[in-house]
Amino acid sequence: MAATTTEKKQLRIATRNCGFIDPESIDDYIALRGYEGLAKVLTMTPAEVVDLVKRSGLRGRGGAGFPTGIKWGIALGNKADQKYMVCNADEGDPEFMDRAVLEGDPHSVVEAMAIGGYAIGATRGTVYIRAEYPLAIKRLKKAIDDAREYGLLGENIFGSGFDFDIELKYGAGAFVCGEETALIRSMEGKRGEPVTKPPFPAQSGYWEKPTIVNNVETFANIPAIIINGADWFSGIGTATSKGTKVFALAGKIQNVGLIEVPMGISLREVIFDIGGGCPDGKAFKAVQTGGPSGGALANKDLDVAIDYESLAACKSIMGSGGMVVMDEDDCMVSVAKFFLDFTMDETCGKCTPCRIGSKRLYEILDRITKGKGTRADLDRLKSLSEIIKDTALCGLGQTMPNPILSTMDTFANEYEAHVDDKKCPAHVCTALLTYTIDPAKCTGCGLCTRVCPVECISGTKKQPHTIDTTRCIKCGACYDKCKFDSIIKQ
């Protein structure tokens, strides 16, 4: 069967085995060259393994994009009686890239952690996973048990004298625990709060020992890189962003779900060729990349290459791979408020800019969406966002204002309409809506009068009705019920 356009645009490395093997069968994984990478690195020196990962150009897929090989090299160079390899499987935002890999190919992560352990001199690994992923936990536990039974974890792996084992620790899904120092504190039984760096975890992390924290997708790339070589991986992508990236397509788009594409592909190709564009003939308006802390990109950005530097230049981020598409019916002020509501709720509260600043930002946006905003509010919104971005302690706070700053930059006219005209161009903000009836279309059927909870619609049967706008609570029930499109929302 010929590949569809959607499939042709994709390249699966991190998700290469998902859907093709029984995730609970170690034999299925081994049949597709599983643990071959681990066997190969045990014939190399740790420095050679680190150098191979460096030359591949792999960057952390958890959001920051720090070169994985350099991070491993720092841990290798720090002498200690114990080192730790940690897998961050605690997806705190509403995306499921890590979950898909752990449920569909858990052995790729187990093997990669063992490879990483050998490379930095660690004998212990920990997967920090959110407790809300019961199937992923079940399959990961089985993968670890089976690997031990086959002699691929534990003592004297492949008769090489290398010892490495893995345990699980459970998180509660806090978004801030995606930050590596907060994650480590949580693993130690402390409150999940970030700490000032340096020292970096690769220097002093879990129990003050050198610790490498990589996310699931980063680890999933490692065995393929070891088997196929650094040149193979670095030949995919762009000059600064190598390999592929897994994205979760969501929102107003025909084809939702997970995709894996080469770095450097354009947003246009992802949204329209793979995603199929917006449904119901609606016009594309924006795409939020990078999850709740990302930025909104508009039509003018559709031909931007998806890599770390290009997205940053557009005031957005790669993040962990969220991609939410919005159409003509979405209000960008409400979108910014929606994402801020999430990050405000997820702040750990340790630093003042994030704890208090997020609340002040939300209050300003709330006033604007309720028709009470002023031009001074717009100035305050922008200046406070910039201050928080520069002064917050960790990445959560530093990227929190991204949705606000990007929408204010690209959709300034919408903010101005909310403030100056007290109108929501997308007809989303309830407080700024007005419902009226078009007498030319109204048949006087009475359906609207029966659903109005405050009885503010009046009229004679089979004659045009009217809405008392002074009593209307703008619930939209009449608009949804009318079969003749006679209710006007503006």
From Swiss-Prot:
Q: Name one GO molecular function term.
A: hydrogen dehydrogenase (NADP+) activity
Q: How does it assemble?
A: Heterotetramer composed of HndA, HndB, HndC and HndD subunits. HndC is probably the reducing subunit.
Top-tier EC class: oxidoreductase
Quote the disruption phenotype from the UniProt entry.
Disruption completely abolishes the NADP reductase activity.
Q: Which residues form the 4Fe-4S ferredoxin-type domain?
A: 433-462, 463-490
The scientific name of the source species is: Solidesulfovibrio fructosivorans (Desulfovibrio fructosivorans)
**What keywords were assigned to this record?**
4Fe-4S, Iron, Iron-sulfur, Metal-binding, NADP, Oxidoreductase, Repeat
- Catalytic reaction(s) noted: H2 + NADP(+) = NADPH + H(+)
Entry-linked InterPro entries = 4Fe4S_Fe-S-bd (IPR017896), 4Fe4S_Fe_S_CS (IPR017900), NADH-UbQ_OxRdtase_51kDa_CS (IPR001949), Nuo51_FMN-bd (IPR011538), Nuo51_FMN-bd_sf (IPR037225), Nuop51_4Fe4S-bd (IPR019575), Nuop51_4Fe4S-bd_sf (IPR037207)
Activity-regulation annotation: Inhibited by oxygen.
What pH-related activity note exists for this entry? Answer: Optimum pH is 8.
Give the similarity note: Belongs to the complex I 51 kDa subunit family.
Name assigned to this protein: NADP-reducing hydrogenase subunit HndC
Q: What does this protein do?
A: Catalyzes the reduction of NADP in the presence of molecular H2 to yield NADPH.
Write down the EC number: 1.12.1.3
Q: What cystine pairs are annotated?
A: none
Q: Which Pfam families match?
A: Complex1_51K, Fer4, NADH_4Fe-4S
